[in-house]
C-alpha cells in the first residue's frame, strides 16, 4: 500500500492497516526567546500606565511574569522599572515581588510615604520590612505553608467590586490533603488598617491602609502562587471542581487588580476582553474521537449556523488500529471534515491515538512523520511508538493535507492529559493555540499565554483556552443546561469567556441541548468558534497602544498598532465619550469604543473628545 505525502513523495508500506493519506509538511521551527529583560519589554510610554516597580535586585530576580499575565489579561496598561523616582511620577504603583530590609533605604521609604500622603496609590505583595510597617498598616507577619483557605471580609472596599459571588468571596489555596501548600504571609494589622481578606488561621491576607490623600493595599500572597502556579497546573490541587462549575480561584486576583486600577486611576482606560463591545463570549467546540462521531458533526454545524453561531471541531486523526479502537481517519469521514470546513466550521487537532498516557509521553525527535510514525495504544494509559511531537505534528500534517486550505493551529489533547513538553511541541510544530486544560483545574476563566515547559520563567507562543463546560460528566450535558448557563453567566459578569466541549458521538440529545443553551444566551454574549476568538485574543495580547492628551482641552489621542489582522478591539473608558474619529464606533453607554478592522502592521490614530 502507498500513501501520497506532501510534495508528491510516495511511501511504500508493509502495513496493510495504514490508509492512503495526503499530508502537508509542517516545518520544525526553532524556539524564539522573547526579550529577556522586562525593563525593555515593557517600557514607559504614556502617563496612564501603572508603574510596576520591580523590587528584586541581583542576577537572578523573581520573574514578573505572574504580574504581567494578570495585567495583560485585564487590559491594564503598565510599564516595568527599577527606578523608584520614575515609578513615583505615576499615580498608581505596584511593588513586585516583595519588599525586605534590602529593598529601600530609609530615604526611599520616606519618598513612598510622601507619595501616598499626597494622593498616590500603591498595591504591594509580601512587604516584610519594618521600615514600612506604618505605611502599610501592619505590626507583624508570620510566613507559613499550612494555610489552606482564604475568605474576604464582609467590609466593602473598591478593590472587591467584582467579587460578588460565593465562589469569589472564598477560595482555596491548596487541598486539605496536603499538609503544606503555598507560602502565605499572615499579617497582624495596625489599629487603623482594614482587613479585606483573612486566612483560615485568622491572620490578614489582604489589608488596606489610608495615609493622607492616598491609600495602600498589601497582599500576603504571591501572584506567582495564586495566578501563574494555577495556570501552569502546578498548584496543590487548589481547585474545588474539575469541570462544569464556576471556579475563579486565580481570576479573583486579576479582578482585584482591575478594580484597584478602575477605583484610583485618573481617567482610566482599559483594553476590554471581549470584541465588539460585548460582555462575554461562548466558544463552542466538538471533539471528534470515535469512528461514528463524524456524521453527527454535520447536525451540530447546522444547528449552530441556524443560531448565528459556529464551532471548532477537534479531530483525532487515527490511522492505526490498536488496543483502544480501530482506525477511522479515511473516507467517508474525510469527506465530512471537508464539508464542515467548507460550511464555515474550523478544525483543530485532537492527536492521533488519543491516549490517557499522553502526559507521560517523551517529547520525541521532531522528525516524526506519516506514515513511518506508527503509535499504538496498548491499554488504558500505555502506548508504544508514541511521542508528543508525533501526536502533535503528524496530526497537523494529515489535517492540512486532507482538508483544502486547512492550517491547523489549534490543539486539544486526548482526555485532556498534558505533558510538560506540550508547549514546546506545539510551538515548534507551528501551532498557536491549545485547549487541553479545564478552567476549573487551572482556576482560570480568561485565556492566557502558556508558559514554556509549564514553568514560571517564560511564556511560549501558545495561548491556552481552558474548557469550562463538557458533556460527559453525569447526568450528561442534556440534563445540565441550566447549570451550564449559570456558569456562563458568572463568567460573563467578569468579562471572561466560557469554552464548551461537546463530543459529536450523537446529535439527538446533545444537539437539542446545545440549541437550548444557545437560545437562552443573552444577546451580549458572543457565540463563536474557538479559532476565531483565539485569533482575536492573540492580536489583543500583542497590541501596542497608548493614550495621550492632545493640545485641546478634553481631547485625547488613542494610538493603536497591531501586527496581526483583528476585528472588534474594544476600549473601555472611565469618562463618557462625546466624539471620536478614525472610523471607531462608540457604544450606546458612551464608555466603550470599538475600533475598525486593523490590517497587519497598520497603525491608527483616533482623536477622542470626552463628554464632560
Predicted regions and their residues:
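Aromatic-Pro/Gly-enriched surface loop or interdomain linker
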Residues: 5-91, 240, 248-252, 304-305, ...
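Helical hinge/lid and interdomain linker segments adjacent to catalytic or ligand-binding clefts
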Residues: 53-135
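Catalytic beta-strand/loop cores that center a nucleophilic Ser/Cys/Thr
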Residues: 62, 152-228
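A glycine-rich, often tryptophan-bearing local segment used as a flexible ligand/cofactor-contacting loop or short
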Residues: 102-171, 190-191, 195-197
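Metal-dependent polysaccharide deacetylase catalytic core of the NodB/CE4 family, i.e.
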Residues: 131, 136, 281, 294, ...
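Catalytic grooves of carbohydrate-active enzymes
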Residues: 279, 286-288, 401, 462-533
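Surface beta-strand/loop "capping" patches
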Residues: 532-573
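C-terminal beta-strand-rich structural cap/linker in extracellular carbohydrate-active enzymes
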Residues: 591-612
